Structures are given as C-alpha cells and as structure tokens.
Amino acid sequence: MKRMKLRTNAGPLQGTIQVPGDKSISHRAVILGAVAKGETRVKGLLKGEDVLSTIQAFRNLGVRIEEKDDQLVIEGQGFQGLNAPCQTLNMGNSGTSMRLIAGLLAGQPFSVKMIGDESLSKRPMDRIVYPLKQMGVEISGETDRQFPPLQLQGNRNLQPITYTLPISSAQVKSAILLAALQAKGTTQVVEKEITRNHTEEMIQQFGGRLIVDGKRITLVGPQQLTAQEITVPGDISSAAFWLVAGLIIPGSELLLKNVGVNPTRTGILEVVEKMGAQIAYEDMNKKEQVTSIRVVYSHLKGTIISGGLIPRLIDELPIIALLATQAQGTTCIKDAQELRVKETDRIQVVTDILNSMGANIKATADGMIIKGPTVLYGANTSTYGDHRIGMMTAIAALLVKQGQVHLDKEEAIMTSYPTFFKDLERLCHD
C-alpha cells in the first residue's frame, strides 16, 4: 500500500494564505440558487468534492448550472422547476448534500433514491427521517438508524410542524426549513443550542422570510425565492488548520486573508484566545462577516470546551485537540458526542492517531481529556476517509523531529481543501 510521506521537522511557517470558499455557504448557495427564480451567480465557490456532489445532484434534477468567468451561474426555475431524476442521486461523502437536498425534495411530486460512499453510508439519517415523515414525506433508509441509501417520495401537500431538535445539528434544522418553504402554514424549529445559521441568513438573502427568536425559528410557507449574486468568504474551518499551525510551530507568523467570521462559527477563535493565543484581526468587515487574521507563535495553556460552544466549533475539534497537545496543562472537551457520527468517529480516531505519535489523550463518551505539552514522533497513519483527520495529521507532522509520518488515503482532503498540500509547501518556503 502506497502511503504519502508527510513533511516533518518544519521550520517557522511564514506568509499569507487565502483559504478556499466556505463549504457550508457554497452548498447553500447552490441549493437555494437552484430553486430561486432567475439567474444566481456565485463567486468564490468551494470546488471541493462535497460541493461538486451538490452541483451534480441539481444537474440531475434538471437545473442548468455552468461556470462562466470564474463564477458559478445557476439558472433557477423556482420550486416548481425541478424534474424527477433519471438516475440515483449520488452524494459521495457529503452528509450536508444528502440531508439538505432530502429536505428540499420533501415538497416535490416525485420519488428519488439517494446514495453515498462507504463513509456516508455509515452516517445516521434518522435525524432527518423523523421530522420529514411528520411533514408527510415517505422516506426511509436502512435499519432503525436509517443509514443511506435513502428512498424518498415527496409530497406537494407538506404539513407544517413544530419540531424540537433532539441534537444540535444545523443540517437537521436546514432540512426542515427547506421543506417548510414548500409547506402551507407555520413551521417552527426549536434548537437545543444555537448552531450555524447560514441557512436562515441565506433564505433571507434570497428574499425568503423567517423569524429567529433565540433558539426558535419560525417560517410561514409556502414561499418563492429570488435569484441573487453571492460572494462566498474563506472557510474558517479550513483556516483553522493554519491558525493552529501558526500558534504551535515556533517562530511562525501567518496572515489568513478573507476568512468568514459568522458568530455561529467563531468558537475556535474564542477558545484559542482563552488559551493565550496572539491573534489580531485586520480589515474587519462586520456587515459581510469577513476579516483577515494575523497569527503568531504563542505559549498556550489548557482550557475547558463544553456546552453551547461545541456547535460553534464542532468541525474544528480535531485540530483543537492537536493544539491542546502543545498547550501547558489539561484541556477537557465535553458535550461533543456528535463527533462520533461525523465522517469517522472523530473522538476515537483523533485519540488513536495523536496517541500513536506520542500525545497523552484519553477518549471519553462525549469528548477528550488532553494533557500537554507532549513531543510528537513519527507514525504510520490514515485519514480513514475523513478530510479533517488528514489535515490535522499533516499539521501534527510538522512538529515531528524524530521519525517519519506516512498518511494513507490522503485523497480524502479533496473533499474540502483541494489545494491544501500546495498551500502547505508554500508556507514552509515563503
């Protein structure tokens, strides 16, 4: 088996980086553009494999989507403009694509089969199946947990519902709201903790109406959406890898340009500042929720990460775990059981990989206890098909002074950051 040999024993990282477009916003721009009336143009779209799965799904549903002058142009025909697909919709590795598109197709008068790759086929869909069934959709997966493939028969006469989310999940909330846009009457979604709010913001950007009152979102349907011009900011979840690298590699100084800082996504910035990180914000645009972040190597101390903070940094927890291995003292991550049903069981995989490199991490049912600082050594590892695990391991390898780090299945990183290794090499040489 050929494994990728990762760069180790890096000197200070220096330079400026523009991370790819935000994955969450890219998905939603395509989804809402596909059912809005008129021509939607998207600048800065992430061209990773997950977003390409969403684009291909809508092409299969009869929507015309093409690239023109470095923009994605979507010819939306409204909610009535989708056609029954001639084939199965393949969502690849993308849980966002499957869950949000299932919500959207809930109000369509045709049936569809949705499949995914081996990793997606192990991710539970019961969380969207139950609320969509309550709205009148025939939808089912495999076993009680409703694993993909999903079979869905839409319903033009969807019923509005009031639904309290049993878990903190922006994907479930979004699936219900996309269905609610096609249901006659008032749908309410009540969250456990506030999760990323891109769907709510972008529905309004496309001319939709909803009311957000704390953890309660109210939407009266049916509604029509109008095409927009969207500019996608850099993805804070991708910027997180360089943020951490800059903080833990001695002598580093990096400028991360044009990073989206929607407040429902900035948990990682609060955590690293609490741990003692030296970071500064430049060219902050509060209206567009975009800033550049300057980061320099810092001496860090352990912290506790729990409660309402978790949904605001759920995707950044693997790289935060690496950060904690280099901080003085104990870092405790709690209330993060959702990590166990991501692309991998991220609690177990992060613990196993970093411990194999010399870290001191104890996995718990809902998180990790990490003692630092520890020296990291070479190891043979794998992404296990999880892009964020792959990038975490590549940043960890930069700290290794003894031994080699080999990574299997590195192609998983294409999911969200196709130019990751190119950017890494540049920062090591600037």
UniProtKB/Swiss-Prot annotation:
Binding site for phosphoenolpyruvate: K23, G95, R123, Q171, R346, R388
One GO cellular component term: cytoplasm
Localization terms from the record: Cytoplasm
Pathway, per record: Metabolic intermediate biosynthesis; chorismate biosynthesis; chorismate from D-erythrose 4-phosphate and phosphoenolpyruvate: step 6/7
Enzyme Commission number(s): 2.5.1.19
Signal sequence bounds: none
Record flagged with keyword ATP-binding: no
Keyword annotations of the record: Amino-acid biosynthesis, Aromatic amino acid biosynthesis, Cytoplasm, Transferase
Active site: D315 (proton acceptor)
Domain of life: Bacteria
Chain residues that bind 3-phosphoshikimate: K23, S24, R28, S169, Q171, D315, K342
Broad class of where this protein is predominantly found: cytoplasm
Top EC group: transferase
Pfam family, one: EPSP_synthase
Any Gene Ontology biological process: amino acid biosynthetic process
Gene Ontology terms for molecular function: 3-phosphoshikimate 1-carboxyvinyltransferase activity
Reactions listed under catalytic activity: 3-phosphoshikimate + phosphoenolpyruvate = 5-O-(1-carboxyvinyl)-3-phosphoshikimate + phosphate
InterPro entries: Enolpyruvate_Tfrase_dom, Enolpyruvate_Tfrase_sf, EPSP_synthase, EPSP_synthase_CS, RNA3'P_cycl/enolpyr_Trfase_a/b
Subunit structure: Monomer.
Similarity field: Belongs to the EPSP synthase family.
Name used for this protein in its record: 3-phosphoshikimate 1-carboxyvinyltransferase
Organism: Streptococcus pyogenes serotype M2 (strain MGAS10270)
